[in-house]
Amino acid sequence: MSVTFDKKDDNVVVVIGTGPGGGVLASELAQKGVKVVALEAGGRHGPEDFVNDEWASFVQISWLDSRSTSGDWRVAKDFSGLPSWIVKGVGGSSQHWAGASLRFQEHEWKTKTVYGNVTGASLLDWPIGAKDMDPYYTRAEDKLRVTRTGGRKGLPGNNNYKVFEAGAKKLGYKNVHTGRMAINSKDYDDFVACQQTGFCFQGCKWGAKWSAGYNEIPIGEATGNLEVRINSQALKIEHDKSGKVTGVLYADADGKEHVQKARIVCVAGNSIESPRILLNSASSMFPDGLANSSGQVGRNYMRHMTGSVYATFDKPVKMWRGTTMAGIITDEARHDPTRGFVGGYELETLALGIPFMAAFLDPGGWGREFTSALDQYENMAGMWIVGEDMPQETNRVTLNHDVKDQFGLPTPNVHFDDHPNDIAMRNHAYKQGAAVYDAVGATRTFPTPPYPSTHNLGTNRMSSKARDGVVNKWGQTHDVKNLFVSDGSQFTTGAAENPTLTI
């Protein structure tokens, strides 16, 4: 049911962003009778619109606005204008995610207590824990129809997984399976089971993979309490003399500016845009940015310790067939400092098409050694490494006043330096990943550097004390009581697990 709210209606809740955080929140509020206006910077695409072409899809759904990078991380060298790969559109990055849906482990909520003082890291215990989150995890798993939870069967393993599983078992790994995935393993109502056509990063053409865009938003809209305004870029959050937020200034598709009044504002623009909006909302009352009395807005940016390992074999694997992320090894996700680092990591199968493989296998690579790897694409298997990176106050999102966007506002700069713990963990993971493939006869292995970040975390972190973060355990900002954050920027620490289920 379509609805349009008056821009002067100050009884609405404005949600900025419609991804896993904002989209679900907007829909849930609408179902409870709350009037919601969701401002979405991008357009709207459903399964019928997605294209099975990696670069065409990248242009179709990605957030490509101007951004800059700094720091010693490899991404700043290889992709200086693309620090992250996120979606600009209804559903946010749940449109292109692989679907891995994992719970934090108990110790990962209390890393300051468990890991102790790690030099150079700004570790902090979350103000919530496993017991608080378990019932919400169960609700989320049911909503997302996560496989291998709630009695739901797992997805079948493709060839990429079979190679991965065989190598894992030869190494003695015990916890290897086809993962907990927000991808239908059977038909549900109007959503079919996964058809194993692959290329999940380009959007699910069947609608079998959960997305806030086509699973949650339509439910909220059907109540008559949710209006989604597409191509509406939030520019600034306004407040009154008491410091209470009163609305959001945004620009429409034609660049015309509007103000939507609100009684509550929820920021859910991902961990780069959310702090950027708060910083761009600076005023005489909030000179360092809205809700930033602690100076923590933008700080403690995390993106997970990542990398990939690919391998070639003497027989075809055809890794692109079936789900992009078809299996997981969780044995290394434990906290075991004897390995030379705190925290842990997951190994997850991954498949890229030839266009992406050419760009990401060895950025800047050339010559026969590089091209011969691509020649063996049909015989290639692949995995992604994802582990807990250390929060650091100096890893942060700031405003780049030298580069303005199409609306005349400073663009975000993402600064990231790898912590020594991240480097030690990545090297360990490269070794173990290669060993998995060597155990089953790999002819070559290829440790691959991190891609532009898909797991953007921190920058508005959750804390018990106002001085240590930006929001409390409810996502409510410490400084402004009717301003909330509802995305991965709340994360106090990153854990080893993919973040969407927790968001």
PLM regions: where:
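Redox-cofactor-proximal catalytic regions of oxidoreductases
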Residues: 57-153, 314, 386, 393, ...
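Conserved redox-cofactor binding core of oxidoreductases
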Residues: 62-63, 76-77, 113-234
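FAD cofactor-binding and catalytic pocket of flavoenzymes
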Residues: 78-85, 90-93, 126-127, 294-412, ...
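Glycine-rich loop(s) and the adjacent beta-strand/alpha-helix scaffold that form part
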Residues: 28-31, 35, 42-54, 223, ...
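Conserved hydrophobic helix-helix packing surfaces used for dimerization/oligomerization
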Residues: 13-15, 36, 265, 483
